[in-house]
Design a protein with these regions (language model features):
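Portal/gating segments that form or line small-molecule/metal binding sites
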Residues: 1-129, 139-179
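Non-cysteine beta-strand/loop elements that form the S-adenosyl-L-methionine
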Residues: 136
Length: 179
């Protein structure tokens, strides 16, 4: 069975919003290699609407390097408001999301990766559908912005499965739901 693996940039105070404004000073080759390794284990992406729209605007119609990878990767978009997902290789998921995600996990292939989409990550985690949570914790207090766990929906125990630190102070933490 395929796993759903989410990778997120998070500040020390839990902010995940607009990482492009606060990760720069800490992003080095080590962090880039960690991100690359996470992406290499995936052959599809699961995205929420907001992340999908941002990625489609950034990469759709572009070519070369990361744009080719993003455009060619199958993307599954969870949304209750979109009526279509027109970016290349995108499929809309609406209605019974849990059932459709379970079906995706049954298909052959490598991991289904997630980048951003913190609302969807939270929902999947709380519904037992997220298999791996990789957090790249940046040594900065942002102060304001959307937080990874901002909804008081109860406790979800996790098990630390790996950790590594980088020379810029970034720490990569890998978790799975506790058994």
């Amino acid at each position: 069975m395929r796993k759903i693996a989410a990778g997120l940039f998070v500040s020390l105070d839990g902010v995940v919003e607009a990482p492009e404004t606060w990760t720069g000073p800490y992003f080095n080759d080590q962090v880039g290699q960690a991100v690359g390794a996470m992406m290499a284990s995936n052959d599809a992406m699961l995205l929420g609407r907001t992340t999908y729209e941002g990625f489609a605007a950034a990469f759709g119609g572009q070519s070369g390097g990361m744009a080719d990878q993003m455009n060619n990767t199958p993307k599954f978009v969870v949304s209750s408001t979109l009526t279509s997902a027109d970016w290349q290789n995108s499929t809309l998921i609406s209605g019974n999301v849990a059932e459709q995600v379970r079906e995706l996990k049954q298909r052959p292939g490598r991991n289904i990766g997630m980048s951003g989409s913190s609302t969807l990550v939270n929902w999947l985690l709380r519904h037992g559908l997220l298999d791996q949570l990789d957090l790249l914790v940046f040594p900065v207090v942002v102060g304001a912005g959307k937080r990874l766990f901002s909804e008081p929906d109860g406790r979800v125990p996790l098990t630390l499965t790996g950790s590594e630190s980088f020379s810029t102070g970034v720490v990569h933490l890998s978790y799975q739901p506790a058994a």
